[in-house]
């Protein structure tokens, strides 16, 4: 909030207590611009701001700031406008420094916390939730694979047993069929079959070969052959 000259003239050191409040450990030095304004002939130089610090129970205690504002001569006149402006600017710059130091200290503390968490070793007792989930899923997968292997073995055994049983049944059925067929053949007597009217059949074939263009001349033989076949069926 101050000018470039005032920002270059400040030198402070700071610390952060347990409530993350910024404590100035060494006093703030006024900038050259503020000092020059306070050295004007109409106003005496301001008294430096003193800060007292102490330790209480091993922790930092808030600084007790005692500011002695410059007064005019023994006559008790009003403070000059230049001095008021310098004090006001000093207070504004001091507040800006406090805020900036607080932000820097907060970022450093967050970075240190993240670094300490990242550097912690992971032991057997501190397995993360994702690792526990992975272990559980791996065990479930192994259990399912074992169950599938057991079922596969069971089904293969059942299939082999069914195939053996079917082969035995086929063999038994084939033996029974051949045995029944043999018995049936033994009960049936063979019958001799002779051609009917074989003489007339030979004459008809000879007539057709000799007279291919006069087949009507063979009609008498055909009629005789038909009568012979009818008589054989009746007899």
From Swiss-Prot:
It is found in: Mitochondrion inner membrane; Mitochondrion. A motif (Cx9C motif 1) lies at residues 197-207. Induction: Down-regulated following genotoxic stress. Keywords: Coiled coil, Disulfide bond, Host-virus interaction, Lipoprotein, Membrane, Mitochondrion, Mitochondrion inner membrane, Myristate, Phosphoprotein. Pfam families: MIC19_MIC25. Residues 129-176 form a coiled coil. GO terms for cellular component: cytosol; MIB complex; MICOS complex; mitochondrial crista junction; mitochondrial inner membrane; mitochondrion; SAM complex. GO terms for biological process: cristae formation; DNA damage response; inner mitochondrial membrane organization. Residues 194-235 form the CHCH domain. It is a lipid-anchor. Belongs to the MICOS complex subunit Mic19 family. Metazoan Mic25 subfamily. PANTHER family: MICOS COMPLEX SUBUNIT MIC25. This is MICOS complex subunit MIC25.
């Amino acid at each position: 909030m101050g000018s470039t000259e005032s920002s270059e003239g400040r030198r402070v050191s700071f610390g952060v207590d347990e409530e993350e409040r910024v404590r100035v450990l060494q006093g703030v030095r006024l900038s050259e611009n503020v000092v020059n304004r306070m050295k004007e002939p109409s106003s005496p130089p301001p008294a430096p701001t003193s800060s007292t610090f102490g330790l209480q129970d091993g922790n930092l205690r808030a600084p007790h700031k005692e500011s002695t504002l410059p007064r005019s001569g023994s006559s008790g006149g009003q403070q000059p406008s230049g001095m008021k402006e310098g004090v006001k600017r000093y207070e504004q710059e001091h507040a800006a420094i406090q805020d900036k130091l607080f932000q820097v200290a907060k970022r450093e503390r967050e970075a240190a916390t993240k670094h300490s968490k990242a550097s912690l070793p992971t032991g057997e007792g501190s397995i993360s939730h994702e690792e526990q989930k992975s272990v559980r899923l791996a065990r479930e997968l192994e259990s399912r694979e074992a169950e599938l292997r057991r079922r596969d073995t069971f089904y293969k055994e059942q299939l082999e047993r069914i195939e053996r049983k079917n082969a035995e049944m086929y063999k038994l059925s084939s033996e029974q069929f051949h045995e029944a067929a043999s018995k049936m053949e033994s009960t049936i007597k063979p019958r001799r079959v002779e051609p009917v009217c074989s003489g007339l059949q030979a004459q008809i074939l000879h007539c057709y070969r000799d007279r291919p263009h006069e087949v009507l001349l063979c009609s008498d033989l055909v009629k005789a052959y038909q009568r012979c076949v009818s008589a054989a069926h009746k007899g």
